[in-house]
Amino acid sequence: MNPPNPVARAFNAEEVIALLNEIAQPLAAERVTLEAAAGRVLREPVCAPEDQPPFDRSAVDGFVVRLDDAGSEFQIVDEIRAGDWKPRQLQRGETVRISTGGALPGEQLQVVMKEDVQTDGKTIRVTQRRQPGNIRFRGEDARAGQVLVESNTTLHPGTLALLASVGQAKPLVTRVPRVLHLATGNEIVAPEQTPERGQIRDSNSILVRSFLQPWQAGLEQTRLPEDETIAKTKLQTPNSKLQTADLLLISGGASVGEHDFTRSLLEHFGFEILVSKTSLRPGKPLIVARRGNQLAFGLPGNPLAHFVCLNLFVRVVLDKFSGCGNTELFQTGTLVAKLESDRNARETFWPARFELNHRQAELTPLRWSSSGDLTSLATANALLRVKAGGEDLAAGATVEFVPTNF
């Protein structure tokens, strides 16, 4: 008797996530301009090439005086603007007008704010000397060689500004993923078309495209006919992206119906099937496959199930591809309203709306009727986790959820 095929069993969410974290690997790194690096993951630490700031500089607009000169009246002998370099030895009774960011002309100095002096343009009279001396000292932000940005950091505007300030014009970042998305189903028509009887508009293609935007994926989308032979021929053409895609997403055809051929299509092109179904609701018909470093998902065609699988599983792979490590998907929050359980035998991911109240996530379950229900997704920004066969959840109960608008 042959042993049971482990792929044939239904995987739970944790098992699929653990598998994806194990098999997905960071993509290659490349050097790009700062403009192209926004949102990408840094693949090497960035160190300060010199002290930051590299010289003592004024933190205010004002006048430079000697620390050991306790006088109140001074003669203006020079002016230093930001970008000037004018070293000099100040004598007692002398001052230099200085702009914010200007390099101090020497050491053992103090900057008096312009608000604390009276001046006729040639001399000043100090009315108040505050401590400290309004100076940003050399190296007070970072010393030469100090790590400024760690590897595996996602680059946001503030980080990019720091890189620019230390001359890192071409940081080493993870390249963007190449994704091929195949939509299946003869009933699908373009959103701008009027469906005939038995047809529906394609909502999954824009769902996939918009979902991929945070990872800046290079996306190729095409439709496959509901004919396996024709589909295979189309994917074998020289211009097919199947050979170069890092990630293959197939919408629909992941179940076991007579016209569902996603699994056999993947096997035909040499993909090893790792998962053939899950114990989730919605999202039971899910396929996970691998060919070398390429990963593939056969996603359920129903939009809500599609949405759930993208946020639970495809997101994990994209984060691993980017180099930022394992994704911490689940967060905890509090239910605002009671959720009546239908005692379903499968773990359910329920569309919900969450808001932060005093740093605590509060979740409101949204109504949904089936895995094809799109109306709840218009306002959903979370998936509420409901355990299999669970009891009703009262308002105020602590629950797990996955944020979806990130």
Indicate where each model-derived feature is located.
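Intrinsically disordered, low-complexity, positively charged segments
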Residues: 7-74, 154-155, 349
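Generic structural signal for well-ordered, non-membrane alpha-helical segments
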Residues: 9-17, 30, 34, 56, ...
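Flexible glycine/proline-rich
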Residues: 14-17, 30-35, 39, 44, ...
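Short, glycine/charged-enriched hinge/interface segments at domain edges or termini
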Residues: 2-11, 19, 64-221, 367-368, ...
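Short beta-strand/loop turn elements enriched in aromatics
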Residues: 30-34, 52-74, 107-121, 353-377
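Solvent-exposed alpha-helices and their adjacent loops that cap or buttress functional pockets
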Residues: 56-58, 67-69, 87-91, 104-106, ...
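Helix-rich terminal scaffold detector
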Residues: 1, 6-13, 171-299, 303-309
